[in-house]
Amino acid sequence: MKKYCLFVSLTLVIVLTSCSKHVTDPLVSNTYFSQWNECTALSALKDYVDDVTNPKSPNFIKVEDHIATFDMDGTFVGELFPTYFEYNLLEYRVLDDPAYRDKAPEDVRQTAQEIRDFVRNGKPLPDHFNLKHGRAAAKAYSGMTLAEFDAYVKAFAEKPANGFKGMTFGQGTYKPMLEIINYLKDHGFTYYVVSGSDRYIVRALATAVGFDANHVIGADYGLCSSKQGDANPLDYTMDKDEKIIRSDEFILKDEKNNKVLQISKEIGKVPVLSFGNSSGDAAMHNYCLSNNRYRTAAFMLVADDDARDHANLAEAAKREAKWREANYYIISMKNDFKTIYGPNVQKVDFVFPK
């Protein structure tokens, strides 16, 4: 009798264990993807993960090569309140922050004003504004320690997100995309943020939703130790009481092909999964799809929901057509997401102080 009970117990354990690992089980799928509608992109992702994590599959990928890359703005963090987080932050720093606004150099002030004119009046930004912004941001945050800057970013992230009710900037993440991140983590994937935004802004925002600080790649700015001054770092040795501070040097904007080069330098492996939302992510996607060793997949999120977000539907339609032609999987915010920012968040009109 004891042997029979032991056999039944072991059998039950084996059955329960095998069920808990079967990613296609409806209960498991519902646990991971409660914020999703059934859709082609989600089915494709689950099929992909099921396939490449199955040791018996010809497409099996060793766990050390389970590399996934994510853009940030517009991919898992909102970029429509009313523009990129880092643009909103610089506008505030230069034009509204009483601790800095009277110190801002004229070129930095001009850049911040161009952001304000863009978001409030619809005035187009100048060509190559991403580089102009980078140079201005380098000056605006120069002298801040990394800890001070991290705290500054997080304090701004606690402000109400313009254009929404019931949400701060920091809470403005796409909840369905966070479910994908958790799903991949639980299935042995190592995931990186590869963003065009300031690396240290991305660290502050992305670590709050589960990314490790050393898995963040972004636009690069100069650093130095606090007493280094103008000394060449090759000719200088920092003291024990020094801290690392931001310099006024803008080094690199991590967009388009720079994303590929940064991935190659910092990760050292070609991703097998890639997630993005814009032309700035296409090179990263193509780099992923060029990985001939393994089965790969790339996903583009389309901001096509003007009921729950401040979407430009004409632009969304153009992007969707382009991404389908490139053979990327399409994630539709309107059709595929049960919620975007959460059930208690409501889109409202933008409000600007007079």
Q: Which positions does each model-derived feature cover?
A:
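Bacterial N-terminal signal peptides that target proteins for export
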Residues: 1-8
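Non-catalytic pre-domain segments flanking phosphatase-related domains
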Residues: 4, 18-72, 80, 94, ...
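Bacterial N-terminal signal peptides
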Residues: 8-15
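Single-residue recognition of alpha-helix boundary sites
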Residues: 14, 82-86, 206, 292
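C-terminal cap/substrate-recognition subdomain and adjoining C-terminal extension
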Residues: 23-34, 50, 65, 148-354
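Electropositive phosphate-/nucleotide-binding environments in soluble metabolic enzymes
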Residues: 39, 143, 257
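A metal-dependent, Asp-based hydrolase signature
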Residues: 81-84, 88-170, 175
